[in-house]
């Protein structure tokens, strides 16, 4: 794998990446996950997004760079993970995924884990 794009900031470290990918896998079981840049944009605009995860090895990177701007407008944390293939596997699809959105839900089985990951992502953004 090539070096991650310098525009991909903030980039999660290995432990945070694993934590995020585990949470994404669980969120997909609870139907709290939207896959792809377009669906992530929709969740941001609807206000149901907890946080956004993007892949740093997207080529060209510009296809996801509208999301950090939207996230900052909506005050939603966002983070880059190193691999689109790993993100796709965590989402439960056989294709690479460039971005994913973990959404809010009334059932809230994952709420404590979502809050933990959100805090870790917000610490990266400071």
From Swiss-Prot:
Keywords: mRNA processing, mRNA splicing, Nucleus, Ribonucleoprotein, Ribosome biogenesis, RNA-binding, rRNA processing, Spliceosome
Molecular function in Gene Ontology: RNA binding
GO cellular component terms listed in the entry, alphabetical order: box C/D methylation guide snoRNP complex; nucleolus; precatalytic spliceosome; small-subunit processome; U4/U6 x U5 tri-snRNP complex
UniProt subcellular location: Nucleus, Nucleolus
Species assigned in the record: Mycosarcoma maydis (Corn smut fungus)
Purpose: Common component of the spliceosome and rRNA processing machinery. In association with the spliceosomal U4/U6.U5 tri-snRNP particle, required for splicing of pre-mRNA. In association with box C/D snoRNPs, required for processing of pre-ribosomal RNA (rRNA) and site-specific 2'-O-methylation of substrate RNAs. Essential for the accumulation and stability of U4 snRNA, U6 snRNA, and box C/D snoRNAs.
Similarity comment text for this entry: Belongs to the eukaryotic ribosomal protein eL8 family.
PANTHER family: RIBOSOMAL PROTEIN L7AE FAMILY MEMBER
Chief location category: nucleus
Name listed for the protein in its UniProt record: 13 kDa ribonucleoprotein-associated protein
Gene Ontology biological process: maturation of SSU-rRNA; mRNA splicing, via spliceosome
Subunit structure as annotated in this protein's UniProt entry: Component of the U3 snoRNP particle. Binds to the C'/D and B/C motifs in U3 snoRNA. Component of the 25S U4/U6.U5 tri-snRNP particle, a subcomplex of the spliceosome. Binds to the 5' stem-loop of U4 snRNA.
SUPFAM superfamilies membership: L30e-like
